[in-house]
Amino acid sequence: MAIKHYKPTTNGRRNMTSLDYKHNLSGDKPTKSLLRILKNSAGRNNQGKITVRHHGGRVKRFYRLVDFKRNKDNIPAVVKTIEYDPNRSANICLLAYADGEKRYIIAPKGIKVGQKVVSGEGADIIVGNSLPLSNIPEGTFIHNIEMQPGGGAKLARSAGTSAQILGKDDNGKYVVVKLKSGETRRILARCRATVGMVGNEEYSLVNVGKAGINRHRGIRPTVRGSVMNPVDHPHGGGEGKQPVGRKSPLTPWGKIALGVKTRKTKKSSNKLILRRRKDAK
């Protein structure tokens, strides 16, 4: 997908870029039966308290029901449209199954309108087909990877991402997969994945250009703690510019901000990680 550049008519437009969807999407309107109303909580919980900062004020949008399970086995489907999805970085494509049902899936790189895809153990190794990891050969690039059999895809769903199958255990229970982050981990061989990479890989190259675009996306400004008042942040207060005044930087809630590990030490999935992403760099 091509990157569109703008003439510097204003300071905000000067470095702005966007994706040229005109020549890459089919231009169809979304299927109404697969749309749901998406409420914007603006980072508040049921008590109205802020639980996630810097959220709120985005444009209204509908949620597209995306099929992450791909459990409609051995029924061929045809790609009808490739559409924009405002809720994710990847595009989505509409599948029309032979029995009349329609479902959205994440659009893989290189998929075309009119292409046939299928799910199931006997599916061919073709971009867009979904099958268990045990049936996919080593070296294949995959996306939409399940963590638990039948639980739906959790890994490699963003634009341009993929993972690679490195090998399989001797007993055939686990498959070794290398993720985009560099982490190498074992995943149950009964879990499903989709062949190929996620499309729209140039999404990360887009320069929003101005703060107003982020406001449309629901991203509010991030204010430094050192310019707040003492009642709002441990770094706040003082006459003019002041240092932190503590042994180490703190979060707004008074906990140490830097150098503290945030992953649970007794997490059950630790034994499945063969190489941490931080060790891979």
Curated annotation (Swiss-Prot):
Signal peptide segment: none
A cellular component term from Gene Ontology for this protein is: large ribosomal subunit
- Alphabetized PANTHER family for the sequence: LARGE RIBOSOMAL SUBUNIT PROTEIN UL2M, RIBOSOMAL PROTEIN L2
Q: What's the short name of a Pfam family annotated to this entry?
A: Ribosomal_L2_C
Name this polypeptide is given = Large ribosomal subunit protein uL2
The record's function comment reads: One of the primary rRNA binding proteins. Required for association of the 30S and 50S subunits to form the 70S ribosome, for tRNA binding and peptide bond formation. It has been suggested to have peptidyltransferase activity; this is somewhat controversial. Makes several contacts with the 16S rRNA in the 70S ribosome.
Q: Which UniProt keywords apply?
A: Ribonucleoprotein, Ribosomal protein, RNA-binding, rRNA-binding
